[in-house]
C-alpha cells in the first residue's frame, strides 16, 4: 500500500486582484441561497483529485491545501514519507510548482495541467517529475488500471458545487480554446450515475456540468432522470456552459431537464471580433439567447473575455453597455470575467498584469470596470 499526497493551492496562496475578488464575493453572497457555495479553500473542488482517488482505492491518500506559500508544501513533503506527490499546474501556480519540485529532489512528483510548454521544459530540467497529460496517464505511471469515476472522500463535508462530466470534446473550433475539437465522446450512463452518487460526501445544492458545450452530446437529456440520484432533499438543479445559439434554441428544453443556470460564451458583444476568433455566436444569437432564457426562467451568466486582441475603447464600451443593463434588470444573474490567455506565448501568464502589450492600460481599466460595476449591482 502506497502513500499518495495530493497538493492543492488554495485561493489564499495567490495574489488578490482587488475588484475581481470584490465581484466574486458579491456574486456568491447574492446567490448563496440557490446553491452557489464557495469552498473553504478553493472556489470549487479540484475534480482531478476525485478522479485519481477513484482508481487508487487501495492506497493511503492524503490531501494538503497550500494556503500561503511554497514553504508549506516543501515542509510537508520533506517531513513526510510519500511514494508520490501529485499536483495540477496552471498558469498562476507554474513557477510555485517548479520551486517545490526543485526543493524536494528526493521526492517523486506527478504533475498534470494546462501549460504544456512550461511542463515539458520543467520535465527536462528536473529529474524527479513526470508529466501526465491525462488522468489515464497518471494511472499508467502509478501502475494501476484506469477507470473513470469520482471519489470525494477526501473532501467529505465540504460546502461546494461539484462537477460532473457527461462528455469530452467540442464540435466548435474557437481560436483561443485548447479543448480538443471536432469530436464528442459521451460518458456512459453508468459512469454518469456513479459521479452523481459520489457527491453524497459533499454539501451541495447545484451540480456543474463541465462539458465544454452542453447540449452537443446526445446524452444531455439524462439530466432529467439524474436528479433522483442526488441524496439531497434540497437539490436545486444543474449549471451548464454552452453557446448562445443553443440557449436561443433550447432554453425551454434545458429548464425541463432541470438546468437551473446556463453560462453562455458571450466573450464580447462585437460581431467582427466574434468572427475573428471563430466563436459560434453573433450579436443576434446573444440577444436571442437572453430573451429565450428570460422567457423560460433559465438563469443566465455571461462569460466575458478581457484582453482579446482587437478590443478597443469602442468595443469594450459596446459590450459593457449591453451587459450591465441586463444585470440591472435581472436578465443576467452575473458575469464570468476572464483574461485572454495565449498558450503559445507563456512568458507572462498567470497574473492580471500579464497583458503587457500596447493595450495594457486599456485592458486593465476595463477589467476593473467590468468587475467593479457588476459587484456594485449585485451588492444592492
Where are these regions (language model features)?
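A short, flexible N-terminal coil/short beta segment enriched in small residues
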Residues: 1-55
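Conserved SAM/AdoMet-binding glycine-rich loop
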Residues: 4-6, 193-301, 306-311, 330
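C-terminal accessory regions of radical SAM enzymes
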Residues: 4-16, 314-380
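Short hydrophobic segments within beta-strands
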Residues: 7-9, 88, 112, 167, ...
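Canonical Radical SAM [4Fe-4S] cluster-binding loop centered on the CxxxCxxC motif
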Residues: 17, 29, 34-41, 46, ...
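Glycine-rich beta-alpha loop elements in corrinoid/cobalamin-binding modules
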Residues: 48, 55-149, 335
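Short beta-alpha junction loops
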Residues: 113-118, 306-308, 339-341
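Catalytic cores of alpha/beta
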Residues: 120-125, 250, 309-325
Amino acid at each position: 500500500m502506497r502513500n499518495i499526497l495530493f497538493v492543492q493551492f488554495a485561493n489564499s496562496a495567490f495574489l488578490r486582484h482587488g475588484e475581481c475578488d470584490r465581484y466574486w464575493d458579491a456574486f456568491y453572497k447574492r446567490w448563496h441561497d440557490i446553491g452557489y457555495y464557495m469552498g473553504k479553500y478553493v472556489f470549487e473542488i479540484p475534480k482531478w483529485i476525485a478522479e485519481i482517488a477513484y482508481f487508487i482505492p487501495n492506497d493511503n491518500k492524503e490531501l494538503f491545501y497550500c494556503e500561503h506559500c511554497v514553504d508549506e508544501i516543501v515542509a510537508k513533503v520533506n517531513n513526510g514519507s510519500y511514494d508520490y506527490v501529485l499536483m495540477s499546474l496552471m498558469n498562476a501556480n507554474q513557477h510555485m510548482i517548479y520551486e517545490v519540485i526543485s526543493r524536494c529532489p528526493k521526492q517523486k512528483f506527478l504533475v498534470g495541467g494546462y501549460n504544456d510548454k512550461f511542463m515539458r521544459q520543467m520535465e527536462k530540467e528536473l529529474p524527479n517529475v513526470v508529466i501526465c497529460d491525462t488522468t489515464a496517464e497518471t494511472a499508467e505511471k502509478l501502475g494501476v488500471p484506469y477507470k473513470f469515476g469520482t471519489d470525494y472522500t477526501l473532501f467529505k463535508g465540504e460546502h461546494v458545487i461539484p462537477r460532473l462530466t457527461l462528455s469530452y470534446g467540442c464540435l466548435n473550433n474557437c481560436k483561443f480554446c485548447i479543448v480538443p475539437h471536432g469530436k464528442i465522446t459521451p460518458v456512459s450512463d453508468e459512469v454518469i450515475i456513479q459521479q452523481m452518487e459520489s457527491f453524497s460526501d459533499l454539501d451541495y445544492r447545484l451540480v456543474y456540468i463541465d462539458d465544454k458545450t452542453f447540449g452537443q452530446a446526445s446524452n444531455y437529456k439524462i439530466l432529467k432522470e439524474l436528479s433522483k440520484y442526488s441524496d439531497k432533499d434540497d437539490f436545486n438543479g444543474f449549471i451548464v456552459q454552452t453557446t448562445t445559439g443553443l440557449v436561443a434554441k433550447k432554453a425551454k428544453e434545458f429548464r425541463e431537464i432541470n438546468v437551473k443556470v446556463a453560462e453562455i460564451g458571450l466573450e464580447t458583444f462585437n460581431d467582427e471580433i466574434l468572427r475573428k476568433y471563430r466563436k459560434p455566436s453573433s450579436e443576434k444569437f446573444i440577444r436571442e439567447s437572453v430573451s429565450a432564457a428570460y422567457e423560460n426562467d433559465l438563469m443566465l451568466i455571461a462569460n466575458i473575455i478581457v484582453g482579446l486582441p482587437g478590443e478597443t475603447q469602442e468595443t469594450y464600451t459596446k459590450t459593457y453597455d449591453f451587459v450591465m443593463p441586463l444585470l440591472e434588470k435581472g436578465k443576467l444573474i452575473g458575469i464570468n470575467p476572464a483574461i485572454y490567455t495565449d498558450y503559445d506565448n507563456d512568458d507572462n501568464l498567470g497574473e492580471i498584469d500579464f497583458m503587457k502589450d500596447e493595450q495594457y492600460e486599456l485592458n486593465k481599466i476595463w477589467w476593473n470596470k467590468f468587475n467593479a460595476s457588476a459587484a456594485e449591482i449585485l451588492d444592492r
